[in-house]
């Protein structure tokens, strides 16, 4: 996917959750902000603690009254998180580029190729792993956002213990199994 198509796609995808929330939201007095490609909305970088890939926060929880949090995981390398469950939110995955992502949502086994997306419902255990040889890129949308943004803030710190069950519990999730790949 070329850079122009990717950027257009990201802009279109990020508009979808707002259309859903529009009827419920109060108009903001804040100016509209554009988040450039390969940048983070907060202005400082985040890392996926297990794989050290980039996590770019694109839409912050506070911008949508806790309804939506959107993060782009770019420069993905082989691996992924432990099997876990979210008590409070759905998680939508949109695989943008790279090799493949293998997933399990509940008992269903899934393979995502670039352009594919899937929704993991709340309270359904899920796990994923990137298996491409070239760096990959995937967009995650969480709704409602709950405490997920602070989870990513905390786990992107250099000394963070990613597999800490207490950290997951404190953010409305539970580890229920190992990662698909070590």
Can you describe what each PLM-predicted range is?
Residues 1-17:
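N-terminal secretory signal peptides and thylakoid transit peptides that target proteins
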Residues 47-83, 89-90:
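A short glycine-rich, His/Asp/Glu-containing loop-to-beta-strand
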Residues 107-122:
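Short acidic-glycine-tyrosine-enriched beta hairpin
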Residues 149, 153-182:
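Acidic/histidine-enriched, glycine/proline-rich intrinsically disordered or flexible terminal extensions
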Residues 122-149:
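Ligand-binding loop in jelly-roll beta-barrel domains
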């Amino acid at each position: 996917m070329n850079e122009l198509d990717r950027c257009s796609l990201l802009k279109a995808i990020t508009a979808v959750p707002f259309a859903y929330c529009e009827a419920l939201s109060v108009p903001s007095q804040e100016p509209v902000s554009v988040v450039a490609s390969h940048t983070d909305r907060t202005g400082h970088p985040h890392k996926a603690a297990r794989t050290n890939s980039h996590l770019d926060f694109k839409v912050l929880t506070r911008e949508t009254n806790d309804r939506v949090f959107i993060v782009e995981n770019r420069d993905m390398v082989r691996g992924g998180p432990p099997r876990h469950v979210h008590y409070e939110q759905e998680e939508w995955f949109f695989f943008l580029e790279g090799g493949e992502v293998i997933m399990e949502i509940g008992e269903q086994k899934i393979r995502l190729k670039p352009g594919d997306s899937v929704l993991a419902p709340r309270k359904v255990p899920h796990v994923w792993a990137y298996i491409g040889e070239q760096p990959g890129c995937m967009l995650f949308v969480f709704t409602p956002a709950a405490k997920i943004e602070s989870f990513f803030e905390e786990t992107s710190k250099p000394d963070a213990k990613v597999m800490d069950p207490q950290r997951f519990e404190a953010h409305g999730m539970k580890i229920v199994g190992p990662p698909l790949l070590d």
